[in-house]
UniProtKB/Swiss-Prot annotation:
Transport of potassium into the cell. Likely operates as a K(+):H(+) symporter. It comes from Flavobacterium johnsoniae (strain ATCC 17061 / DSM 2064 / JCM 8514 / BCRC 14874 / CCUG 350202 / NBRC 14942 / NCIMB 11054 / UW101) (Cytophaga johnsonae). It comes from the Bacteria. It is found in: Cell inner membrane. This is Probable potassium transport system protein Kup. PANTHER family: K+ POTASSIUM TRANSPORTER, OSMOTIC STRESS POTASSIUM TRANSPORTER.
Length: 657
């Protein structure tokens, strides 16, 4: 890990705490915009439901967010980084193959959540305008929300370095506003504090006819807990844990303040109190304060959306490095480490968000679609966390009850959320299934490809390569010929590479270079190793890169060459006499292989589906040369047929007459 990055997120400081407010808590911090509104819906306000609901909210924030994520899961860091893929990279060391399943399901569910969070947060905030303009059409609200989304996704290409400076003070104002508004209402009806007693939650769940299914809406208060873990690398465990004390306090005050207001108006409905989009979040505000409250809420919702978008970019980047996702173009708009921009994902998210807004129109309708995907992610995190605790040799008498309790809690939330399937939950589930399918196909195809890749010992061909280099009867193909190789062992090489050099068209070069990229299970590391196979003839370079590092092979390779020349380990000047005496450096040529599925295959039905789907997706993804950051003018693409199962007997008969 780079020192600069390590220092960035490891220190506890006032600045670090403020940055944490601006980055980490957008999702969970904007939940008061819609949680109590979702719990009540169109029903008449009932004290039992309000007290039971707010008790469930308090204990969900305590058990799920505080204990599971802030205290336990944040301890499972991968060199300071968090998130479900970082956790998978840790437990991958156990060599348990099936752990890939919860990793893919969890990552896909988290990405699906990124499509619903911006629309519901921004819509909930913007709908507050109706407090001043009750007759405002729903379509007008929809257009405003889409406009905000368009601006938000458009500025992603410029990075968040500039606007990011305002995130922290803005979220500080937001949380201070939440706490103050809630506290004022509690002072009017202090009895609401009794809802801290878990009896009220139990009473709601066990006695009230629809009590259990209220959990589906209660869960919305903790959907942002996974983001606390995913963004740990930006702020650090200590900063998150300390700042959470302040954040949870303001959230609890606001939730209880909304509950106090509602109990005071028992017997009414939200629609009677605030019109079509009656929302207790805005109802507890003094009328004169509403303009300021709406603006602050909208800005907080935008910041929450920004955090989800940035998190999605990071997640896709990690998925690519772990071979879960096809290669896509990545840009680095600023020099801030870890900040990246993925154009294709950015606009897919945008159109997904717009689709959600157009389909559901109102935040109240979106509440039914929200929660199902993220609870799946949380369950998958719990499964992976279990193996992390085993890996850390945590005592069974502590680990087994802990994991069992959380699986029971989370499966209860899952069952409650499934009831919302027909009313909107199907949307995020369909998106999650689509993402799971892409990741599974890509991973299995890569695995099949690896299993059928033939490797040879490079020593068996060292002599012939050296002879080819000296064979003046063959035209020189390049001074330096560079091949990318997937062979993990330094003394091995794919058979197709040797075939390309010796048989497809003999390629004479002064020096042959074989470059291998090894993705590490830790996030930030850039190392390389040089293996001399034959002095001034054959070399292998192994790059060891963290799973969050950009793969800029062209720049890295040239840096390695400069270092080798400086050390006197290689002579890269042209061997043409006229050029050599003037110290002219020879040219470099990269040769990349592009596979296609051969017709000479007798694949099993499932392999046929996987491989055809893989090559279809591959056509839409980034080319190898762009993925490795190579200059297209110095790259040669060669196509190779991919034969996995050649037919054993094609039934051909020779005729002698």
């Amino acid at each position: 890990m780079s020192a600069s990055h390590k220092n960035l997120h490891s220190k506890l400081s006032i600045g670090g705490l403020l940055i944490t407010l601006g980055i980490i808590y957008g999702d969970i911090g904007t939940s008061p915009l819609y949680v109590m509104k979702a719990i009540l819906g169109n029903h008449t306000i009932n004290a039992d439901i309000v007290l039971g609901g707010i008790s469930c909210v308090f204990w969900t924030l305590t058990l799920q967010t505080t204990i599971k994520y802030v205290l336990i899961t944040l301890s499972a860091d991968n060199h300071g980084e968090g998130g479900i893929f970082a956790l998978y990279a840790l437990v991958k060391k156990t060599k348990i193959q099936w752990l890939i399943v919860p990793a893919i399901i969890g990552g896909s569910a988290l990405l699906a959540d990124g499509i619903i969070t911006p629309p519901i947060s921004i819509s909930s905030a913007v709908e507050g305008i109706r407090a001043f303009y009750p007759t405002m059409q729903t379509q007008t609200i929809v257009y405003i929300v889409i406009t905000i989304l368009f601006i938000l996704f458009t500025i992603q290409q410029f990075g968040t370095k500039l606007v990011g400076k305002f995130f922290a003070p803005m979220m500080l104002i937001w949380f201070a506003m939440l706490g103050t508004l809630g506290f004022i209402q509690i002072m009017h009806f202090p009895e609401v504090i009794k809802a801290i007693n878990p009896y009220y939650a139990y009473h709601l769940l066990s006695v009230h006819p629809d009590g259990f299914f209220v959990l589906g809406f209660v869960f919305l208060c903790t959907t942002g807990a996974e983001a606390l873990y995913s963004d740990m690398g930006h702020c650090g465990r200590k900063n998150i844990r300390i700042s959470w004390i302040f954040v949870k306090t303001t959230l609890v005050l606001n939730y209880f303040g909304q509950a106090a207001y509602l109990i005071h108006h028992e017997g009414s409905t939200l629609q009677q109190l605030g019109g079509e989009n009656g929302n207790p979040f805005y109802l507890i505000m003094p009328h004169w304060f509403l303009p300021f409250g709406i603006v602050v809420a909208t800005l907080a919702a935008v910041i929450a959306s920004q955090a989800l978008i940035s998190g999605s970019f990071t997640l896709i980047n990690e998925a690519m490095r772990l071979n879960f996702w096809p290669k896509v173009k990545i840009k680095y708009p600023t020099e801030v480490k870890g900040q990246l921009y993925i154009p294709s994902i950015n606009w897919l998210l945008f159109f997904g968000c717009v689709g959600i807004v157009l389909h559901f129109e109102k935040s109240g309708n979106m509440e039914h679609a929200y929660g199902l995907a993220i609870i799946l992610c949380m369950i998958m995190t719990t499964i992976l966390l279990n193996y992390y605790l085993i890996m850390k040799r945590v005592k069974l008498y502590f680990m087994v009850p802990l994991i069992t309790i959380y699986l029971l809690i989370e499966f209860s939330f899952l069952i409650a959320n499934i009831t919302k399937f027909a009313e909107g939950g199907y949307v995020t589930l369909i998106i999650a299934i689509l993402l799971i399918s892409i990741m599974t196909i890509w991973y299995l195809a890569k695995k099949i490809n690896k299993n059928y890749t033939k490797v040879i010992k490079i020593d068996d061909y060292k002599k012939v390569l050296m002879e080819l280099s000296e064979d003046l009867s063959i035209p020189k193909y390049a001074t330096h010929l560079v091949y990318m190789t997937n062979a993990n062992s330094v003394d091995e090489l794919e058979e197709k590479v040797i075939y390309s050099i010796l048989q497809k068209r003999p390629k004479r070069a002064d020096i042959y270079w074989f470059v291998h990229v090894n993705i590490l299970t830790e996030p930030y590391k850039t190392q390389y190793k040089v293996t001399e196979i034959a002095k001034d003839d054959i070399y292998r370079i192994d790059f060891n890169l963290g799973f969050r590092e950009p793969t800029k092979i062209n720049l890295m390779f040239r840096e390695v060459i400069r270092d080798m020349v400086k050390r006197g380990e290689v002579d890269i000047t042209s061997r043409y006499e006229s050029l050599n005496k003037n110290n002219i450096i020879g040219d470099f040529k990269f040769v990349l292989s592009e596979k296609f599925l051969s017709n000479d295959n007798d694949l099993r039905w499932h392999e046929n589906i996987i491989m055809n789907s893989y090559f279809f997706i591959k056509k839409l993804s980034l080319s190898e040369e762009r993925a490795f950051g190579l200059d297209s003018s110095s790259v040669k693409i060669e196509k190779f047929p991919m034969v996995l199962h050649a037919p054993e007997n094609i039934g051909l008969t020779r005729i002698t007459k």
